[in-house]
Amino acid sequence: MLYRVSGFYKRHTRNFTNIDYGYYIRNFIHHIASKIYPYAKVVLPNFRAAHYFYILTLVILGSILVYPVKTCAYIDVLFFTAGASTQAGLNTVNVNDLSLYQQIVLYLLATLATPIFIHGSLLFVRLYYFERHFDNIKERSLMDYRMRKSATLARLGSAPTMSSTRLNTFNNQVLGFQEREAEKGSSSSPQSSSSQTSQPVSTAYNDQGGNDIEHHSEPSDSDDDESGNGPVTFQEKIHFEEPQRPRSQRRHSRTDSGIKFSALPHPRRRKSIDPEDMYRSINMLQEHKKNQEAKSKGIQFLNIGSPVRRKSRSSNIEAFPEEDTNPSRDDEITPATNSVGTGNNDEDEDDILIIKPPIEIENSDGANPIFTKKKKLASQIQFKETPGKAKKWITTKKRKHYNPWTSKLKKTLSNSSKKGSLSVVPTDTEDDSEDEEYASIDSETSDISDNEHAADNAEGSDVDSVGSYEEDEDEDEHNSDDDDDDDDGEGERRLGNGASLTKAQSHLVLPSKDETGGKKYTKRSNTLDTPQQNTSDGRKIRKKAPKRKTPRTQRNASFNQHSNVSIGDGSIENVDTNDSYQRLSRTMSGNYLSWTPTVGRNSTFIKLTDEQKEELGGIEYRAVKLLIKIIVVYYVGFNIIPGVMLSIWIYCMPHYKNLMISSSISPAWWAFFTSQSSFNDLGLTLTSNSMMSFNQNAFVQILCSFLIVIGNTGFPILLRFIIWVMFKTARPLSLYKESLGFLLDHPRRCFTLLFPSVPTWWLFFILVVLNGFDLVIFCILDLHDDTFKGVDMGYRVLNGLFQAFCTRTVGFSVMDLSQLHAATQVSYLIMMYISVLPIAISVRRTNVYEEQSLGVYAKENAEGVDESAPSNYVGSHLRNQLSYDLWYICLGLFIICIAEGKRLKEQDLRFSIFAVLFEIVSAYGTVGMSMGYPGVDCSLSGEFNVISKLVIIAMMIRGRHRGLPYTIDRAIMLPNAAMKRHDRLQEEHAINRHNTMERTTTLGRVATFGNGPIDGGNNLLTRAITNIEHRLRNRRDGRSESSTVSEDPRYVVRTVSEV
């Protein structure tokens, strides 16, 4: 019985503790929302309508809560609650005359109506919809994170600095030297050296990251040795430690030692070249030069032949059979050749180690070794003493016919997928007979290498230094045009001592992704930023940066779209691909996606699959969840901490404490109310003269200035700075860092008041300029005014700065505004009007659906896009804002002038039309600054009648909605079918925009200058194809356009001056 009771208690206790309260809360909210939604959809169709409803609700509800105390008339109560709900801050009655209860209600209304609170609440709504309408989004996002982290750790743990091909080449090199050691260490017949079993080789290598990573290569197939003693297995363990060359390599790097590889599996692409072969040869050449004798007549160095495509054999060299599995091949080598004890080093140095390809090893019967030896040919690449004038290697270039147009077109046609929107796909039927002439004599077959790339590699190297590749890359970057124009058939380079160097050709083709899991590289076509890679001997290899620089607006609008152009039949076919990553607009700050995104302007993701959309939705969900925590801490912290600071300060200052007590104000309540009014931009104070009592106190003015900035205009700046600091201090590869990286890269997909880096810097610059302008005007016109008698000069400047901060947001007054210079008053009037524009324009220009919000929708065909469309829409936003504002201000001024006609006829200087306009603009800008009126402790609005007060209330409510985002804004939309439709439209618009910018940029560069185009002929094929498109379009549309014929008669290009 006791056992049953215990089990029942444990079962129910476990069920109680495992209750998902969030699930029940979401169900409850969903139940209520499903009942209200059909009616709310009609009344509140968009975010702006919902915002109006929320503000009006707070105004009316607040008036209901405040009025029962009956300390003032209802119109004044309504005026107070409207000012608190809109942060206008105008008052018709002294705030200190209200009861504490009424002050607390105003305090809460201001806290619940700030932009930070309202826009932050949208994050909770979006988070609810994420969890409610996407099944298991939390679990899926966590699984995606673990997958990305595991993949990243696996990639970091598998030596990312060495590709599979490079590692395979290095291993085979070690095999050759190991066999050499076996031959040298044997004192018996040559057959005894071949019968020894090879031991595992351990080689040291230095990894830049300092990771001690151990890698085990795959064991080769078991092959019997020549004596039949058993299989030979080669397993290598590479420890990343201090870089050093193998002992055998250091000991036997002589003039005639060499390694030769048979044909490896060929990728399905045109031949490319790995610079490692050439640089290894140069390195071994330098090692040899240190040990050579003074009277040596010639130098020979190692030439590593790379795999080639074709199976034909060279007609002018001795070829070794590719499928030779006869084990007696080694027997053809005389004993004198392999003998160590004979001392015949010349004969011994004529052996070449040939490693068979994996396919040949797999197809063999297992009785043959994986490597054989043969006599090295006498036609090895070497230095020869040739008469003639000494010339430099790099600077001397042999030229034939230099034609910039022909050379650039040839380079464009020979390179695959150059950075740009057009790429030429090379065919296997191209005839490169000119390159056959310079094929490597050590190659097993007679494949044709890309001679142009080999020449560039040779010209970009320096023989005299081992680690000079990085410097030569920089030099080649600046002189790339000259290098490309050199004759590809040039076979010799000259040294300073008069010796000529025959080029070392390499035919190594990197494996394709399908065969070996590696990446495809070509020297000139790869434009994706990749990490630096190291060769097997410790040298770094860097990828070239793209030579063409594009404007920021073009880079932001770019995405991956390649056009495969077939020149043979004259057809032009545009093909969109998702596998190429050449036109990325930006890189990811964190490892938050398992794929490389294609991003257009304003964080528009292009060409996403369903799986990618799910992964993107998961990281966006976690980013929103993290952002909620940051904003909650930010908002609560800056509402409480400054109040505590002011409380400590005022209790430590007896003068100000007694001032509060004499005015029947609690010092602690003053501290919290003032800090909250500053941070929430309310503008109301418990003291009757606003902040004039503190015009000679730096602490209050500086602290309140900081709160005023970070609570309004400076909020996006400080928020992004906080996220950036958190990102920099976050633990690598953590879920926390991924979410922060997504917020930094794509902030407007998550939050309306968080902007990208460039708009944030612009906002900071505008903030500094506007406040600096107000301070300068004040110092010029009012610094020495009689109003500031008795105030030190330093405090006068501080007062001017404090008033500049208050002018555009909170509306505090540290001086009598009516006594200032007229020009200063006008400048303050202008600043109050433009107070919301920096935030409003930043919100709208960073909108993901910016074009759609302005009515610029994507066309079905790219030809319908207007090429003269602007790259940004700041002018459109400003025009919309002016059309939204001006008529309402004019209408309000007209109504008040009618209602206050009698007072205006009295010609009272403190009740003039300018003073009324100043009050209207202050209410419409939700600032709360007023010229005041003599004898009263409130704003000028206290002298208005009921109609004028209602107009001011309407101005407050209308002006509070100036800075709202457009109706079509992704950050305020719920993840539903409407959002998917807008995403699809924005994607189409981004594609058409990219095509338009490509055409515009191309046409803007084609004006001829001298003997060729201004850009030196870059992107010539793109221009030619673009011209064909324009000519065909003009012919179809029946339009005639003037064209400019360049000096090359084969191309007709348009000249566009206004781009």
Curated annotation (Swiss-Prot):
Transmembrane stretches, start-end: 47-67, 100-122, 626-649, 697-713, 758-781, 821-844, 878-899, 946-968
Superkingdom of origin: Eukaryota
Main location: membrane
Biased composition (Basic residues): 540-552
Gene Ontology molecular-function annotations: chloride channel activity; high-affinity potassium ion transmembrane transporter activity
Gene: TRK1
Family from the record: Belongs to the TrkH potassium transport family.
Expression induction or repression: Induced during biofilm formation. Expression diminishes when pH was altered, either to acidic or to basic conditions.
Extracellular topological domain: 68-73, 91-99, 650-668, 686-696, 782-796, 814-820, 900-912, 932-945
Activity modulation: TRK1-mediated chloride conductance is blocked by 4,4'-diisothiocyanatostilbene-2,2'-disulfonic acid.
Effects seen without this gene: Abolishes salivary gland-secreted histatin 5 (Hst 5) mediated killing.
Protein topology in the membrane: Multi-pass membrane protein
Segments of skewed composition (Acidic residues): 428-449, 469-490
Protein name stated in the entry: Potassium transporter TRK1
Biological function: Potassium transporter that mediates K(+) influx, as well as Cl(-) efflux as a secondary function. TRK1 is the major K(+) uptake transporter that regulates membrane potential and intracellular pH. The TRK1-mediated Cl(-) efflux should serve as a Cl(-) detoxification route and may play a role in sustaining C.albicans on mammalian epithelial surfaces, or in physiological saline solutions such as saliva. Mediates candidacidal activities of cysteine-free peptides, but not of defensins. The hallmark of salivary gland-secreted histatin-5 (Hst 5) killing of C.albicans is the rapid efflux of cellular ATP and other small nucleotides and ions from the cell as well as concurrent intracellular uptake of propidium iodide (PI). TRK1 is the channel for Hst 5-induced killing and histatin-5 may directly or indirectly alter TRK1 function, allowing the efflux of larger anions, including ATP, and the influx of small cationic dyes, such as PI.
PANTHER family: HIGH-AFFINITY POTASSIUM TRANSPORT PROTEIN-RELATED (PTHR31064:SF30), POTASSIUM TRANSPORT PROTEIN DDB_G0292412-RELATED (PTHR31064)
UniProt intramembrane stretches: 74-90, 669-685, 797-813, 913-931
Keyword Translocase on entry: no
Low complexity bias locations: 186-203, 412-423
Organism: Candida albicans (Yeast)
Protein localization: Cell membrane
GO CC terms in record: chloride channel complex; plasma membrane
GO biological process, one term: intracellular potassium ion homeostasis
Topological domains annotated Cytoplasmic: 1-46, 123-625, 714-757, 845-877, 969-1059
Regions of compositional bias (Polar residues) in chain numbering: 335-344, 524-536, 556-566
